[in-house]
Curated annotation (Swiss-Prot):
Highest classification ranks of the organism: Bacteria, Bacillati, Bacillota, Clostridia, Eubacteriales
PANTHER family cross-referenced by the UniProt entry: 50S RIBOSOMAL PROTEIN L28, LARGE RIBOSOMAL SUBUNIT PROTEIN BL28A
UniProt-listed GO biological process terms: translation
Keywords assigned: Ribonucleoprotein, Ribosomal protein
InterPro entries xrefs: Bacterial_rp_bL28 (IPR050096), Ribosomal_bL28 (IPR026569), Ribosomal_bL28/bL31-like_sf (IPR034704), Ribosomal_bL28_bact-type (IPR001383), Ribosomal_bL28_sf (IPR037147)
Organism: Desulforamulus reducens (strain ATCC BAA-1160 / DSM 100696 / MI-1)
Protein name: Large ribosomal subunit protein bL28
Family assignment from sequence similarity: Belongs to the bacterial ribosomal protein bL28 family.
Alphabetized GO MF terms: structural constituent of ribosome
Top-level taxonomic group: Bacteria
GO annotations of cellular component type: ribonucleoprotein complex; ribosome
Length: 62
């Protein structure tokens, strides 16, 4: 799975626990959006998590 280009947030692995206590592995994926942003002075399409978008860490290109 892809990572956030700003904070490098990626997939988290953990354990799902059922009511009968059966443990199975599972993954949590970050909420990534493909946005057009200014990178090194030129517009480029990058994958960014929604937390970085909301906090203003990304300068969007028009």
């Amino acid at each position: 799975m892809a990572k956030c280009a700003i904070c490098e947030k990626g997939v988290t692995v953990g354990i799902k626990l059922s009511h009968s206590h059966i443990r199975t592995k599972r993954t949590w994926n970050p909420n990534l959006q493909r946005v057009k942003a200014i990178v090194d002075g030129s517009p480029k399409r990058i994958m960014v998590c929604t937390r970085c978008l909301r906090s203003g860490k990304v300068q969007r290109a028009i």
